[in-house]
């Protein structure tokens, strides 16, 4: 069963650490660990404690999800957009109320900006991630969180 297998994680291998460092630098006192393909930020002082805890208890989640490295590209996790960290790996685009609501509904809307990943914010509050492509916009807001009626 899922409860018989402890949460497995390792420190990020050097190659992946170099790829991540080229895109994003974690705040001081944080390390990056890897669980399957997912990158997770964990306070340095918690690492050895988490090793002990996971050996004796079922751990469902630890730290804050940063995202997944796909080659030299970081596909950011929604947790990172929701964090209070000042520095993000990609540029933030401020949107108006209508575009913010469209984003939260996962509805189509137009957004001007350079091609690539961006965080979306409304009134300086980050909402999530989009990827601007030449002819469309991919919305990475969690589907289960979307606004259905407003």
Predicted regions: what they are:
Residues 1-150:
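Polybasic, low-complexity RNA-engagement segments
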